[in-house]
Amino acid sequence: MSKSIEKMISHLKNQGFVFQGSEIYGGLANSWDYGPLGCEVKNKLKKVWWDFFVKKNPLNIGLDSSIILNSKVWKASGHIDGFNDPLIDCKNCKSRWRADKLIEEFDPSINTGIMSNLQLEEYINQNNIVCKKCQKKDFTQIRKFALMFKTNQGVLEDDSSIVYLRPETAQGIFINFKNVQRSMRKKLPFGIGQIGKSFRNEITPGNFIFRTREFEQMELEFFFDPNDSNDWFKYWLEQIEIFLTQKISLDKNNYKIRENLKDELAHYALKTSDIEFNFPFGWGELWGISHRSDFDLKVHQNLSKEDLTVLKEENNQKILANVIEPSVGVERLMLAIFWQAYTEEQLEENNSRIVLKLPYNLAPYQVAITPLSKQLNQNANQLFLELLKDFDAIYDETGNIGKRYRRQDAIGTPFVITYDFQTLEDQKVTIRYRDTMKQERILISQLKDFLNSQFN
C-alpha cells in the first residue's frame, strides 16, 4: 500500500489531530486548528524540546517575550527594510507567486538567493516560465512584498502607533539579553531558549502545516565569547541530531545535513547549516542552525544606545557576545513526525490497517484499557482510573475488540490492555503492542512497572 500526503491529512482530520481553521465559514487559507489529539502531540513535543535544550542543559535558561514589540526592534534587526519576498502577479488569472519559487521549481539548481529582482525577472522571461495555475506567460513586474503583519496599537491609527506581529521569536531574546544576564548572574557561554508564536504574511504558504502564516518556533540563542576555543556550532549541531534520533526517534535515513554555500548565507550569518527532511513533496528545511556573529547585539546596542557588552573578569575587557542559533518550527517538526509515523499495512486475509507509529513519548495516549465484555466494564474502568494517575490513558468499551484495536492503532496508542474473564481468576490482563500486534499476559500488579519500563 502506498501512502500519500492527501491520505495522511484526511486521516489526521478524521482522528482529531488537525482541523481546517474556521471550517464552518468556508475555512481560511493555510489556517489549521489542532484538535484534542493534535494539541497533545504538540504540547508533548514542545515539552521534550524544552526539557532537552533548556531544563536539562546546565548552560541554558528560558524566556517568554512579547509577541508585539516596539517597532524600533524591527528597524534595528533589518526586518522593516529587508524582510520581504519578490511578488509577481499573473495578469491572465490574477494569481500571485513568489518569483524565486517559480524559478526554483523550474530549475532546482538555480540559487535565487543571490539574484536581484531584475535578475529574477529576466530569468523568468528568458526561460519562458509560465503561471502554474493557467499555464500562461503574462506576468507583472516583480515588486517587494512585506512579510510582517502590520497593525496599530492604541486609539489613533497613524505612523506613531504602527506595530508588528513578530516574524520570529529571536529578537525578543536579543533585546532581553542584558536583563537575563544580569538577573540570573550568567557568565559566557550561556543560552536563552524560547517557544512562541510567530507570524509571516507569506505569499504562497502551503504543503499542509509545512508553511503557514501563523506558526510556533522553538529557538535557542547561545551566547559565547568570540575568542572561545570551543566549536559551539559543531556542539549544537550534534545536540540537534541527538534530539532528532534519540528524543523523537526520527530515522537518520529521512534527513540530511546541508551546509549553506557562502552566497546563500543571510546578511547576519557567518555559517549556516540546514537539517533537511524528506517530506512527501520532497526535501525541505526542517531545522536551521546559524552562526549569527555579534550582529544582533551590535545593531540593538547601536540603535538603543544601551550597553549590551559583557565584561571579561580576567582582563576587564568588554566584549559583544557571538551567537549560535538552532531554530525549528513546531508544526514543521510535527509534519515530519506524522509523515514518518503514518503507516498503511496489508495484513492477512485481505485485511489492512492504518497505524500511527508515533514515538512513545509523543503519542496522545500511552495506553488504552478495554473490557472484553460489558459484564467487565466496572472492573476495567477501575483499572483505567488507577492507571490514569500515572499515565496518559483512555478507556474504550465501544464496538468489538478488533475495532477497538484498530481505533487505537489509528491514533498511535502504543499499548492496549484487555480485561477479560480470565483476569478475574488469575489477575492477569492481555497487553497488545501497537507496532507488532503481539500480545502477552501480565499481572495487574506488574502493569505500572512494565509501562514505566517502556516509556522511560
Swiss-Prot record:
According to the lineage, what is the superkingdom?
Bacteria
- EC number(s) recorded for this UniProt protein: 6.1.1.14
* A GO BP entry: glycyl-tRNA aminoacylation
Where is substrate annotated to bind?
R98, E168, F215, E216, Q217, M218, E219, E325, P326, S327, V328, G329
* EC supergroup of this enzyme: ligase
Q: Which residues bind ATP?
A: 200-202, 210-215, 285-286, 329-332
Reactions catalysed, as given in the entry = tRNA(Gly) + glycine + ATP = glycyl-tRNA(Gly) + AMP + diphosphate
Keyword annotations for this protein, in alphabetical order, are: Aminoacyl-tRNA synthetase, ATP-binding, Cytoplasm, Ligase, Nucleotide-binding, Protein biosynthesis
Q: Name one Pfam family in it.
A: tRNA-synt_2b
InterPro entries recorded: aa-tRNA-synt_IIb, aa-tRNA-synth_II, aa-tRNA-synth_II/BPL/LPL, Anticodon-bd, Anticodon-bd_dom_sf, Gly-tRNA_synthase/POLG2, Gly_tRNA_ligase_bac, GlyRS-like_core
The subcellular location is:
Cytoplasm
Q: Which family does it belong to?
A: Belongs to the class-II aminoacyl-tRNA synthetase family.
Oligomeric form and interacting partners: Homodimer.
Task: Spell out the PANTHER family in the cross-references.
Answer: DNA POLYMERASE SUBUNIT GAMMA-2, MITOCHONDRIAL (PTHR10745:SF8), GLYCYL-TRNA SYNTHETASE/DNA POLYMERASE SUBUNIT GAMMA-2 (PTHR10745)
Instruction: Give the protein's biological function.
Output: Catalyzes the attachment of glycine to tRNA(Gly).
- This protein is called Glycine--tRNA ligase
What organism does the UniProt record list as the source? Mycoplasma capricolum subsp. capricolum (strain California kid / ATCC 27343 / NCTC 10154)
